[in-house]
Swiss-Prot record:
Keywords: Amino-acid biosynthesis, Aromatic amino acid biosynthesis, Glycosyltransferase, Magnesium, Metal-binding, Transferase, Tryptophan biosynthesis. Belongs to the anthranilate phosphoribosyltransferase family. Its cofactor is Mg(2+). It holds the Pfam family Glycos_trans_3N. Catalyzes the transfer of the phosphoribosyl group of 5-phosphorylribose-1-pyrophosphate (PRPP) to anthranilate to yield N-(5'-phosphoribosyl)-anthranilate (PRA). It catalyses: N-(5-phospho-beta-D-ribosyl)anthranilate + diphosphate = 5-phospho-alpha-D-ribose 1-diphosphate + anthranilate. Its EC number is 2.4.2.18. This is Anthranilate phosphoribosyltransferase. It comes from Francisella tularensis subsp. holarctica (strain OSU18). Pathway: Amino-acid biosynthesis; L-tryptophan biosynthesis; L-tryptophan from chorismate: step 2/5.
Length: 337
């Protein structure tokens, strides 16, 4: 076993960790074997050094090895998630996109937690709607099979996250746990859209996904946002057959108008709940509908639907039908049975 001191000394010298060192470090973290002051300094050292794809992949495996198992789902399973920490406090776009994608017929396992650095995390929102976020894994699997949608609350599957919650709250900044969150979905989706908070993270995240054997994925950075943007360019790394292709898309590629970031500002969970409810009922603002649609359109690429304009139009029609709220309502009802 590698000593914590030797790992910490390397980090304080801003040296990269080996796979084994990173695995051991995150095993210590998730088992609550690191004191709070040291936790914060380790997280800051990693942030200053910049995390490597090897460190991230090792951390993912350490966290998976300490996670409650989720029963395997047959066929394709999608994940759509952002790292958070983009600082703009937008409405919960990836959560809404997951509900819309499920309504469109794609099985989506949405993994996440409560807010750390924003006003409203994905599961703050879901709780405000009345979703039982601590549904047993076998029930969540059945919910996925019935309604194409399942919600997996991170602390429920890995109670070790309670050991690092205080450090993350104290730091009030993005840490490696923002990066790890999207990668440790216990349902192990084989098709994922991951939004990152920095352009510098696109390639390390994509390389990590290749290392983890993910079938198809896109990593996106939306000019300040951790999702596909409707205000400016979105930088993309797409993974197929273990190859990474980098490109850039803009709102015009989706056939939509360009909006401002402020058009997507959210608020407290209750305010976000009302905004999201209106979108799902087919009564949302154009900017809100567009933001959700482009993210689902990007997910559809992973199912060999390459025409982003056509994808976006199909999704907008589904949103405007109001059917998406029925999907959420069915999941709420099922989760509280």
């Amino acid at each position: 076993m590698i000593s914590l001191k030797s790992i910490v000394d390397k980090l304080y010298n801003l040296e990269d960790l080996s796979y084994q060192e990173s695995y051991q470090l995150f095993d210590y973290f998730i088992k609550g074997q690191i004191e709070l002051p040291l936790q914060t300094s380790i997280l800051i050292a990693l942030k200053l050094k910049k995390e490597t794809s090897i460190e991230i992949a090792a951390a993912v495996e350490a966290l998976f090895d300490n996670t409650k198992e989720f029963p395997k789902i047959k066929g394709d399973l999608a994940g759509i998630v952002g790292t958070g920490g983009d600082g703009f406090n937008t409405i919960n776009i990836s959560t809404t996109a997951a509900i819309v994608a499920a309504t469109a017929g794609y099985k989506v396992a949405k993994h996440g937690g409560r807010s750390v650095s924003s006003k409203s995390g994905s599961f703050d929102l879901l709780e405000s709607f009345g979703v039982n976020i601590e549904l047993a894994p076998d029930q969540t699997k059945q919910c996925l099979e019935l309604y194409n949608l399942g919600f997996l609350f991170a602390p429920f599957y890995s109670d070790g996250f309670r050991h690092i919650k205080e450090a993350r709250t104290i730091l009030k900044t993005r840490t490696i746990f923002n990066i790890l969150g999207p990668l440790i979905n216990p349902a192990r989706p084989n098709k994922v859209v991951i939004g990152v908070y920095s352009k510098d993270l696109i390639l390390p995240m994509a390389k990590t996904l290749v290392n983890l054997g993910i079938d198809r994925a896109v990593v996106v950075y939306g000019s300040g946002l951790d999702e596909v943007a409707i205000h400016d360019d979105t930088y993309v790394a797409e993974i197929q057959n273990n190859q990474i292709i980098e490109y850039k898309v803009s709102p015009v590629d989706f056939g939509i108008y360009t909006y401002a970031i402020k058009d997507l500002e959210g608020g407290l969970p209750e305010q976000n709940r009302e905004i999201i409810k209106q979108i799902l009922l087919g009564k949302g603002k154009e900017a809100h509908n567009a933001a959700v649609a482009v993210n689902v359109a990007m997910l559809m690429r992973l199912y060999d639907k390459d025409d982003l304009k056509q994808n976006t139009q199909e999704v907008l029609e589904i949103i405007k039908s109001g059917k998406c709220f029925n999907t959420l309502q069915q999941v709420i009802n099922y989760s509280n049975k």
